[in-house]
Structure formats: C-alpha cells, structure tokens
C-alpha cells in the first residue's frame, strides 16, 4: 500500500496532495 493518507483533500496538481497521493480526475487527492 502506498503512503497516501486517507483524507479528502481538494487539489489542482499532485504536489497539492500529501504523501504519495496524486491528484485524481475528480479534483481530489487519492
């Protein structure tokens, strides 16, 4: 499992997201 905290965080780009999360198409980290 990758190091992505399970929090709902809005984003515009991957760097907006914590840990190893990426910015998904719906505009939230995942």
Swiss-Prot record:
Pfam family membership, one: Squash
Keywords: Disulfide bond, Knottin, Protease inhibitor, Secreted, Serine protease inhibitor
Localisation per UniProt entry: Secreted
Principal cellular location given in the protein's record: secreted
Site positions for Reactive bond: 6-7
Protein origin, superkingdom: Eukaryota
GO terms assigned for molecular function: serine-type endopeptidase inhibitor activity
This protein's record includes keyword Nucleotide-binding: no
CDD domains given in the database record: PlantTI (cd00150)
InterPro entries membership: Prot_inh_squash (IPR000737), Proteinase_amylase_inhib_sf (IPR011052)
The keyword DNA-binding appears for this protein: no
One GO term describing the cellular component: extracellular region
Cysteine disulfide partners in this protein: 4-21, 11-23, 17-29
Job of this protein: Inhibits trypsin.
Similarity field: Belongs to the protease inhibitor I7 (squash-type serine protease inhibitor) family.
Name of the protein: Trypsin inhibitor 3
Organism this protein belongs to: Momordica charantia
